[in-house]
Amino acid sequence: MLSSSDSKVEPALKKQKYQDKAIDLDKSEEFDKFFLDFNQNQIYQNNSRDLGEQYEPPSNAEPNDLNEEINKALSTFNEFNQTNSIKLSFKNEANSSATESSSPMDSPGTLTSSVTSNDEEVYADDSKQNPSHRISNVQSNSDDQASMTNMVNQSTLTSIKQSMINTSKLISTFTTLKTTYLKLCKEFNYLLNKFKDNEKIKIELINENNELKHLLMEIIKQRELEKSTTRHTTPISNSRKRKCPSS
């Protein structure tokens, strides 16, 4: 039975193989192009050198003979180039048939379309190492990720604990303020009731004072009436007393 790390490494190895094949094909195509260009340059240099040596006209030749020699040299040069171009085209056809006969999975187009740039970097790094190193790297990466998650979890837990402590402190201060506010409200209500009672007493006293004033005024009026009546009755009594001795 294969472990999870081995099952993760196998598709990476397959993709790396396809990538290596694509790189080899690209390198072989570049080498063939370079080889063709190099051969063409060499053929051109050799032909020009051979024609210069074989068909160099004599100094005493006439102009008509010189033209004929030039035409012969050009014809032989063209024939030589045609034969070499046929050979080169045959070689190119053979290379193209070899690339076409390969499987579609080996073509660079499918490989480049199936593999992303990030995977290419990972595969290039993995190609320098053997499978045991890859497995160890995968395990180390998983361990690093686990340690990072643990660190993140610890940091989040500490932050949550600190926030809970702060909220508990705020709640305690809020409760103390609430209790003091309620006490102040009770005292204010008590004082307000006392003030209302005092106002009622004050109003009652004012009413009593008014009643007393009214009674006092009535008493004063009665006294005055009595005085006035006594004044009217006293002269009559005196006149009677004077008349009595004469009789």
From Swiss-Prot:
Entry keywords, A to Z: Cytoplasm, Nucleus
Purpose: Involved in cation homeostasis and in the regulation of the cation stress signaling cascades.
Polar residues compositional bias, start-end: 129-146
Region (Disordered) location: 95-146, 226-247
Lineage, top ranks: Eukaryota, Fungi, Dikarya, Ascomycota, Saccharomycotina
A GO-annotated cellular component: cytoplasm
Highest rank taxon of the organism: Eukaryota
Protein name per the record: Protein ATC1/LIC4
Organism for this UniProt entry: Debaryomyces hansenii (strain ATCC 36239 / CBS 767 / BCRC 21394 / JCM 1990 / NBRC 0083 / IGC 2968)
Location within or outside the cell: Cytoplasm; Nucleus
Gene designation: ATC1
